[in-house]
Design a protein with these regions (language model features):
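A short, surface-exposed loop/turn module that caps and links secondary-structure elements
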Residues: 30-54
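Enriched for short, Lys/Arg-rich terminal
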Residues: 1-8, 16-23, 39, 57-60, ...
């Protein structure tokens, strides 16, 4: 299983989210940690973000990088769909 590292921006979004949303994010992170590459809500990004993967959580997107050599998932952003890719 992978370990998770939250980037400061992702951690800030998580801290400011209400408890219900935090629970949904926790569930999504558990799914990501089980298998960070394959799930119905997981997609590898293209273009400038080609090293990133996204998890779709309703209107939110969780963007992360996978580091296979140390079995780590680094979550870079948790934001609304419209602003996360900017």
């Amino acid at each position: 299983m992978y370990k998770v590292i939250l980037h400061k921006n992702a951690a800030k979004y998580y801290r400011n989210a209400d408890k219900k949303l935090q629970g949904r994010i926790n569930t999504a992170i558990d799914i990501i940690l089980e298998n960070p590459r394959y799930h119905v809500h997981i997609k590898k990004l293209e273009g400038e973000l080609k090293d990133m993967v996204r998890y779709r959580l309703g209107n939110l997107r969780i963007l992360y990088e996978i580091h296979e050599n140390v079995k780590t998932v680094r979550i870079k952003a948790i934001e609304a769909r419209g602003s996360v890719y900017k």
